């Protein structure tokens, strides 16, 4: 995974929008974002490593989704736009990329800047509950992702706004990163 500050140039969300300013693992950790690279091997040993992380974080369920034009059909454009709306979740968001690639953009709270995390096969990302973020495919227009969940699979997005800013999960997140 490669992380960097996004440029502020308008344009296709699937383009890199690379400002040239790299982000260190320490900066990502300071905002609660964790990542690992677990190479995908033909024997399937990567599954054990991913499930080990899931167990450590008390995740019990997972599913696999494919995001591309073929799998989403007529809903492709609307789904992609929906994923790109700035939002947060009340649970951690854990994603492991099996095939393809895409971007998770996370807000750096102190500056309101976007940090773009370009993920590809073998990358595992954990976003803390309460962090504002969004997702976009890159120019490959396809990704296959394992989603991990504490309980039953669910994906409830709370789009950014005054009400969401006051959400207890959001306020707890902000407090947790201000302590550091």
Predicted regions and their residues:
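N-terminal leader/capping segments at the start of a protein or of a new domain
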Residues: 1-65
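Mature, function-bearing regions of proteins
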Residues: 17-18, 30, 116, 175-180
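Conserved short histidine dyad/triad with adjacent acidic residue
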Residues: 64-90
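A short beta-loop-beta micro-motif enriched in histidine and acidic residues
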Residues: 80-94, 112-113, 119-121
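Short, conserved beta-strand element in jelly-roll/cupin
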Residues: 88-108, 126
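Eukaryotic short linear interaction motifs
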Residues: 103-105, 126, 133-135, 154-156
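Conserved metal-binding segment of the jelly-roll/cupin
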Residues: 119-139
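Double-stranded beta-helix
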Residues: 136-180
